[in-house]
């Protein structure tokens, strides 16, 4: 008789999880369709990433995207996969991608009620050296009764109904944030399904790791450099923080989520508005952080409170464990006190409901 003991027979897959949440909400099923289609794209990208060398997908395609990054062959493939799968979900009306100058308006016969902003392959500069890369996405509900347009994507992050990222590393992990929490799913290649491995994830109140590209230190605001020095040489003689930086936002943020600490990509003299894009990098990751009990700020305001004016808008980013971010803001506010009043320290807003709650209405 065959021993099936090593195999779990009642596994919680992402599809099952979404269907259960949809049943609880009594929803229409559109969000389920959208997430299932997005997962199919992520599985295909995961496979392409692992076969890139054999399939000759490494290298540069000979062009740059709208934000000035050199476009890699995997970028193009990933972008096409996400766009085509989201179109075929019949759940979206507007798509915003890092790779496209303008928003993509879905054909009338395929339209649904959701707006999706995404970076199909974050950290693509790391492709050739095999470092971890990822896909980032944020999902909004269309709020106007007009014909779909680019303006439908210009919503603050507080309006997100779901957001998350896929990390293509030693395994493929999908982190999905909704109003009811943050859940992590790992791709099991043997059955081709994402399996729930961490439910209702919470970030530590305080970590011991900071993540920033110190190569830009000479162009940083003095408050940034002061904070970094305090992490290296604590004034109270406590243990210094460890420095970790991959250069792929998804990889650096996921480590911060798992271990606690702080991730910084601040503005500098060369990039006074920051470098990361608000709609498809900052907002989705900030949403994940807040739903996990952390904080995400520009230094001057919560990232999720920014009302965007254009789809490729940039923003500074400081996010992570609550106590670490608050410590940064104390230093930042003190440094700026001469020119403006100090800002109140934000509190964790993980339990606040956005305008539209995925667990209340969406499926």
UniProtKB/Swiss-Prot annotation:
One of its GO terms (biological process) is fructose 1,6-bisphosphate metabolic process. The modification Phosphoserine is found at residues 339, 353. It catalyses: beta-D-fructose 1,6-bisphosphate + H2O = beta-D-fructose 6-phosphate + phosphate. Keywords: Acetylation, Allosteric enzyme, Carbohydrate metabolism, Gluconeogenesis, Hydrolase, Magnesium, Metal-binding, Phosphoprotein. It comes from the Eukaryota. The keyword Ribonucleoprotein does not apply. Substrate binds at residues 122-125, 213-216, 244-249, 265, 275-277. The keyword Signal does not apply. Subject to complex allosteric regulation. The enzyme can assume an active R-state, or an inactive T-state. Intermediate conformations may exist. AMP acts as an allosteric inhibitor. AMP binding affects the turnover of bound substrate and not the affinity for substrate. Fructose 2,6-bisphosphate acts as a competitive inhibitor. Fructose 2,6-bisphosphate and AMP have synergistic effects. Mg(2+) 1 binds at residues 69, 98. NCBIfam families: PRK09293.1-1. Homotetramer. This is Fructose-1,6-bisphosphatase 1.
């Amino acid at each position: 008789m065959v021993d099936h003991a090593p195999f779990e027979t009642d596994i919680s897959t992402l599809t099952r999880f979404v269907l259960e949440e949809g049943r609880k909400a009594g929803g229409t099923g559109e969000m389920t369709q959208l997430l299932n289609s997005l997962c199919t794209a992520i599985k295909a990208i995961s496979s392409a990433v692992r076969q890139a060398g054999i399939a000759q997908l490494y290298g540069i395609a000979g062009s740059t995207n709208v934000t000035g990054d050199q476009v890699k062959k995997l970028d193009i493939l990933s972008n096409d996969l996400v766009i085509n799968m989201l179109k075929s979900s019949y759940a979206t009306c507007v798509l915003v991608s890092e790779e496209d100058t303008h928003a993509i308006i879905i054909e009338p016969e395929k339209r649904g009620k959701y707006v999706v902003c995404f970076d199909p392959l974050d950290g693509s500069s790391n492709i050739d050296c095999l470092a971890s890369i990822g896909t980032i996405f944020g999902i909004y509900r269309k709020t106007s009764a007009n014909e779909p347009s680019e303006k439908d994507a210009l919503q603050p992050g507080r309006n997100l109904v779901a957001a998350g990222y896929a990390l293509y590393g030693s395994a493929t992990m999908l982190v999905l944030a909704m109003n009811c929490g943050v859940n992590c799913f790992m791709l099991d290649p043997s059955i081709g399904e994402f399996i729930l491995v961490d439910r209702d994830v919470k970030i530590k109140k305080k970590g011991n790791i900071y993540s920033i590209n110190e190569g830009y230190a000479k162009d940083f605001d003095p408050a940034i450099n002061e904070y970094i020095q305090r992490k290296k040489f604590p004034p109270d003689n406590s243990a210094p923080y460890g420095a970790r930086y991959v250069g792929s936002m998804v990889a650096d943020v996921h480590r911060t989520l798992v271990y606690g600490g702080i991730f910084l990509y601040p503005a500098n003299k060369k990039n006074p508005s920051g470098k990361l894009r608000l709609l498809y990098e900052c907002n989705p990751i900030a949403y994940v952080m807040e739903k996990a009990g952390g904080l995400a700020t520009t230094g001057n305001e919560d990232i999720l409170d920014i009302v965007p004016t254009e789809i490729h808008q940039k923003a500074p980013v400081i996010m992570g464990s609550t106590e670490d971010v608050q410590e940064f803001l104390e230093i930042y506010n003190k440094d700026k006190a001469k020119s403006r009043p100090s800002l109140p320290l934000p509190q964790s807003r993980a339990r606040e409901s956005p305008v539209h709650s995925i667990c209340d209405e969406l499926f």
